[in-house]
């Protein structure tokens, strides 16, 4: 590893970066030892430019493996830039390829460059972009650069990439709005409505759907807070043209994949004050998940054959054995309908990638979606909708069992779902869809919701809501038939 580093770091290469105005001292043995754990194993030596201070902290860091350069050479048209801050305030810039031609699986398979600038000022960022361009002659083919809403150095991008168009990314706008919804401390039904509408719109970003979301924000957000959301972004058609080509399924997969990618970057770099340790942890993760290279080759073969690749790596035999035991325990312990619901959740677990972080009492389970809290102590519970609605083991609880090599136990679910204790539910859950029953359930649910709203309000608010409801009922069904409220 050390020899491979020394070879490419010649005097000629040092002069090349000196011509760029970048100071690079010869790499000392101590610095080489420090960086030894930072480099991804590759058949060819990677390109690395770094600068350390007296405390051995990384002042600047620019890294690209030959594999990453190869990915960029194939897909240079659209660059996606994501920033990750650590506790010291240092920022990791991750460059990823994007666009219709990119069909790569693997959470970091699209990453083509890592950089830590000395400072996020004009000089530091200009230097970072210049090194990226020096590493990648294909930079001239970059047509679009996608950034987050807080990305301020836009003039530097315009100067370094004069022919590229800089746009806000749909993913970063979505994350920005999600964070704002939580910060506003809205009523739970309103917050849930906004989050659901946002997710649906991002997966089908037509002009009509974006306009509906814009109107919904205008109606639900307090006027004084509305400017903070920059809802006018939803009406900027140029932003969404860069994303609209994806189908609903492709959009959902795209957002889920980026969600996990950014989570990985935050987990390894964003949680440690040492840039060196953060990058070492990130690169170790990439080494352990080196199947991304095979997926890259498969993606190229698929594109050359003009057919999408649907190759899915086989699960290890041990994992298959554990999941078969979980299936058996579900069938043995649960009622038929409950087992069917949980087996559907397990199917999602089997086809997904999960990140599991352990805590003292709770575990964070993420399956290519929002993070949920799992309470493993019986009866097991989770913060997701499935578990809250049915009180059954959800995909997150099943992922926890799979990771722990455990099976479902009777005390992990309520008694009403235990086999032999809920026969009255079989006819309902196993029945076919009925329009009459569907309407009845909808009316019942609506009646309960209205009743809850009328009960939990002041007398004045009750009178106002009741009179509004009375007017609606009379105008809809009356006036010849009195509606009993």
Curated annotation (Swiss-Prot):
GO MF terms on file?
zinc ion binding
One family name in Pfam for this protein = ZSWIM1-3_helical
Question: Which parts of the sequence are SWIM-type zinc fingers?
Answer: 363-405
Which keywords are on file for this protein? Metal-binding, Zinc, Zinc-finger
Give the UniProt entry's GO cellular component terms.
nucleus
Q: Which PANTHER family match?
A: SWIM-TYPE DOMAIN-CONTAINING PROTEIN (PTHR31569), ZINC FINGER SWIM DOMAIN-CONTAINING PROTEIN 1 (PTHR31569:SF0)
Q: What is this protein called?
A: Zinc finger SWIM domain-containing protein 1
Organism classification = Eukaryota, Metazoa, Chordata, Craniata, Vertebrata
